[in-house]
Amino acid sequence: MGRGAKNYREMRVWESARAFKKSIYDLVDAKEFAKEVRLRDQLREAASSAASQIGEGYGRFEPGDHARYLKMARASLIECQNHLIDAVDRKAITETVRHAHDGRIVGILRELDPLIGYLQSPEAKENVERIKRQTAERRKRGRKSNDEL
């Protein structure tokens, strides 16, 4: 369901979310987060969740289901934005560091939003139905070939 991707790992948005997750892991492993255990865990979980939701959504067979998981990934990214603001407020990171990570989040959101829009469109539903028909026809032809043997 990733517009040409054969699996979720080929989706550019998943690659972006994974890179963001890794950057958050590096950030929260720094000594500045040593006293912020709960905030560290929340930020780590939200970043991990975004990439996971993108992957899980890809595994859904219906465009509406896929879109729902991408919306959850979107919400997790916005949760990360809030946790990064909390980290600034608690002096675990600087505003400059927050701004850099926020830029990455905005970039991922820009990748997610058109994909969500497509998955909610009539075009996506029509494409899924076309693929289902083609698959059924191939199976039917395969059975006829086997019957002829």
Predicted regions and their residues:
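Amphipathic alpha-helical assembly/interaction segments
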Residues: M1-L149
